[in-house]
């Protein structure tokens, strides 16, 4: 089932292409390795080892999201999962989070595209040496206040 969802999530996140998980020894699925083969749009089929760092991170994220489709969790913490992604893939990643409605995400990020897709932002700032302050910004309330909501 994870392979099915991986192909689906891969295609949605990459805007096309194909993703596939292949058991190295189908006779022993619990002890064998898994080969990840992908074909990003407009490219040839590759194993994950031949991808760039950003592509590897995006494929790993697609795999994680496929697992969440099979086994949803109520809560998920992602720490700078978007750090190696280019701006286009940051936007795709952030947009895809909204497809996983059964899971609440806390995403630690420095990327603007991810922040823009959030419902609520929390920030930590230090206004004076050694004293941290927590900031909270509810983007939906802010849009209503400014009259710029959908």
Language model: regions and residue ranges:
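Terminal ABC-like ATPase head and other globular end-domains that cap long coiled-coil arms
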Residues: 1-150
């Amino acid at each position: 089932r994870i392979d099915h969802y991986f192909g689906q999530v891969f295609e949605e996140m990459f805007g096309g292409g194909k993703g596939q998980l292949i058991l190295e020894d189908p006779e022993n699925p619990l002890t064998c390795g898994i080969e990840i083969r992908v074909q990003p749009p407009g490219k040839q089929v590759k194993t994950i080892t031949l991808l760039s760092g950003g592509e590897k991170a995006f494929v790993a994220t697609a795999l994680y999201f496929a697992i969440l489709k099979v086994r949803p969790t109520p809560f998920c913490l992602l720490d700078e999962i978007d750090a190696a992604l280019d701006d286009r893939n940051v936007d795709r990643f952030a947009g895809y989070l909204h497809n996983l409605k059964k899971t609440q995400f806390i995403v630690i990020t420095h990327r603007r595209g991810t922040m823009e897709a959030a419902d609520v932002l929390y920030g930590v700032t230090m206004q004076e040496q050694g004293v941290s302050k927590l900031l909270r910004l509810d983007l939906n309330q802010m849009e209503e206040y400014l009259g710029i909501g959908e």
